[in-house]
Each structure stands twice: as structure tokens, then as C-alpha cells.
Design a protein with these regions (language model features):
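A conserved helix-loop-beta module that forms one wall/lid of the active-site cleft
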Residues: 89-150
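Short Gly/Thr/Asp-enriched flexible loops that form oxyanion-binding sites at enzyme active sites
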Residues: 70-83
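Short, acidic/small-residue loops that bind anionic groups at enzyme active sites
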Residues: 18, 82-94
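ATP-dependent carboxylate activation and anion-phosphoryl transfer catalytic cores
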Residues: 1-60, 71-73, 88, 110, ...
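Small/polar loops that bind or transfer phosphate-bearing groups
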Residues: 43, 67, 95, 121, ...
Length: 330
């Protein structure tokens, strides 16, 4: 529902700017498939072939792929190669952020710290990585949503058990291994970027220990235990990375803070599941303004209209998000 929220607010915002909006979605439980959300709705699955069928009929000025989660963003490269104009973050920037080796090289070039990590497609590679990085490790398969298949392993026995249970591990679909930073504080940052300037919408502090998936975590805005110096450092790193990657629209960066040291966990070149909470907590409609940026507006133009308040403003409240589990469905 978080990505549904983003798509709906983007459709409303673009309609206000004079665009006709076309929604492609096959989930009947979402608001974005309501008849009055967009100008036209195609009840189609998000596959390259089905989306191209829609594009051949509609001939759109552009396609937005960064508000619906991981499924549409994986279509960006194929769509652009087929001549479809992509609005917002381009496939090259998406690849830079999502390719583990290239992103690690970027962090190294910018002198930004990250937990030691490795990629493995065989048991031997996983063992070698574990010896090099050290336990405990967070291990997870590639190309999954919602933290599915993620686990913390503490020794060789745990690692063997995980690798044996991880199906379809191939060179194209490897397992990621990251050093698990024990006793660290995890943060989510949602931001807007127009390739020239970055606006940090929120810095969310997780209430649980590091390692809970962002969408399922309890978190708080503004941060309740971090120093102003650390928050300023996180904002500065976010801006540096957003501009270096060439993001246009929304991005999300996950951080870990341990002993006053800041580590980048990953950058998502798209909307995250924390965007609705960030928007409601701060009063800044991130999805709405991201869509306007993707349509060509600049952050300084939005700021001049009074739409983007000062990032360093103080508020007299705390906003807290907690996950509500649908126990009746289990």
C-alpha cells in the first residue's frame, strides 16, 4: 500500500500540472486502480510486453518507473532500449545504485564508509567471504522485495544451512553477504533530487536494533537519540550520494550508526515504503513533489513556492510509525 500511496499522489500532482495520467496496475485492492485516480487505467501485469502494449496505444510523453517498488524499476532498462522516454531517474543511475560492485566503488571514491560486504553464488564463495568479513553476517538473496529470505548467520553451520535452503542461487542471482553491525542504530532517509540539488525530506531513526526491514520497522521522526552533528553528517552524505548517482525524483538511503560512526547500507533509487510516513510526519508530500521534479521542475522552484520547508527546522512533536501485523491472516 505504500507504493500505491506514491502512485496515487503522483497521479493527482501531474493532473494538477496539466498532464493526462495513465496507470498500469493489476491489483484490484489498490486505490490506484480506482476509476477516478488516473485519466486511464490499464488493468495489466507489470511485464515488459504488457507495458509496451499500453505504450504503443497511448504514446506517452514519458513513463515513471520509480514509484511502484522494485517490479517496475526492473523494466527501466528494457523500456529505454525500446525507445520509451523515462521520466525521472534514468536506467544508468538505477544500475549504478543497484550494482553492488559499482556502488561500493562509488562509496570508496567519495570516501564514504559502508559495512564490509561480498557477493557469492556458490558455497565456497560464501565461505571465503565469511572468513574475509567475519561473523555475524546478514545474508539475503538478490532481487527480492520486503526483505524476504534475509537472515543473520553467526557461524559456518548457519551459513551452510542458509545456502542449502536458498533456492535458485546462480551467478545472475547471487547471495549478498554483509557484516552485521551489532548494537548499531539503523536510519532511513527519504530525499528528493533534481540532479543539481538534493532536499532531505526526513531522517527516520529505527526503534528496533539494526536489521529490521524498513517497511516492517518501528521508527521515529525526528531522530530521538542522535546528536545534531550525526544528523547533519547523514544529510551531507545523502546529498553527495544523490548527486553522484544522478537521481531525479525520490531516493531512499539506509544507514547504520555505531559508536558515532556512520555507515551506508544501501541506496534505493526509487520511492521506499517509508515515504507515506515521512510525508505525513513532516507535512511534505514527497511523492507529489517527486513527480513534479520528474516532470522537469527544480527543487529551488518548489522551495520558492513555499512547498519545501527548511530541512533543519525544529518541531515540537515526535511522529512514530509502528508495523501492525494482520494476525487474522496468518
Amino acid at each position: 500500500i505504500e507504493f500505491d500511496y506514491c502512485c496515487v499522489h503522483a497521479a493527482y500532482a501531474l493532473r494538477e500540472q496539466g498532464y493526462e495520467t495513465v496507470m498500469v496496475n493489476c491489483n484490484p485492492e489498490t486505490v490506484s486502480t480506482d476509476y477516478d485516480t488516473s485519466d486511464r487505467l490499464y488493468f495489466q501485469p507489470l511485464t515488459f510486453e504488457d507495458v509496451m502494449d499500453v505504450i504503443e496505444v497511448e504514446k506517452p510523453e514519458g513513463v515513471i518507473v520509480t514509484l511502484g517498488g522494485q517490479t517496475p524499476i526492473k523494466l527501466a532498462r528494457a523500456l529505454k532500449d525500446a525507445g520509451v522516454p523515462i521520466m525521472g531517474t534514468q536506467p544508468e543511475a538505477i544500475d549504478l545504485a543497484e550494482d553492488r560492485d559499482r556502488f561500493a566503488a562509488l562509496l570508496d571514491r567519495l570516501n564514504i564508509a559502508c559495512p564490509p560486504s561480498a557477493v557469492a553464488s556458490t558455497m565456497d564463495e560464501a565461505r571465503d567471504a565469511a572468513r574475509r568479513i567475519g561473523y555475524p553476517l546478514i545474508v539475503r538473496p538478490s532481487y527480492v522485495l520486503g526483505g524476504r529470505g534475509m537472515a543473520i548467520v553467526y557461524d559456518d553451520s548457519d551459513l551452510v544451512t542458509y545456502m542449502e535452503s536458498a533456492t535458485h542461487v546462480t551467478p545472475d542471482r547471487p547471495v549478498y553477504l554483509d557484516a552485521f553491525l551489532e548494537d548499531a542504530i539503523e536510519l532511513d532517509v527519504d530525499a528528493l533530487c533534481d540532479t543539481e540539488e538534493c532536499y532531505v525530506g526526513s531522517v527516520l531513526e529505527h526503534i528496533e536494533e539494526c536489521g529490521i526491514h524498513s517497511g516492517d520497522s518501528a521508527c521515529c521522526w525526528p531522530p530521538f537519540s542522535l546528536s545534531e552533528k550525526i544528523v547533519d553528517q547523514i544529510r551531507a552524505i545523502t546529498k553527495k550520494l544523490a548527486l553522484a548517482c544522478g537521481i531525479r525524483g525520490l531516493l531512499n538511503i539506509q544507514y547504520a550508526v555505531r559508536d558515532e560512526h556512520v555507515f551506508v547500507i544501501e541506496l534505493n533509487p526509487r520511492a521506499s515504503r517509508t515515504v507515506p510516513f515521512s510525508s505525513k510526519a513532516t507535512g511534505v508530500s514527497l511523492a507529489k513533489y517527486a513527480s513534479r521534479i520528474m516532470a522537469g521542475e527544480k527543487i529551488n522552484e518548489l522551495r520558492a513556492q513555499g512547498l519545501l520547508p527548511d530541512e533543519n527546522r525544529t518541531v515540537d512533536y515526535y511522529a512514530v510509525k509502528e508495523a501492525v501485523m494482520p494476525w487474522s491472516r496468518f
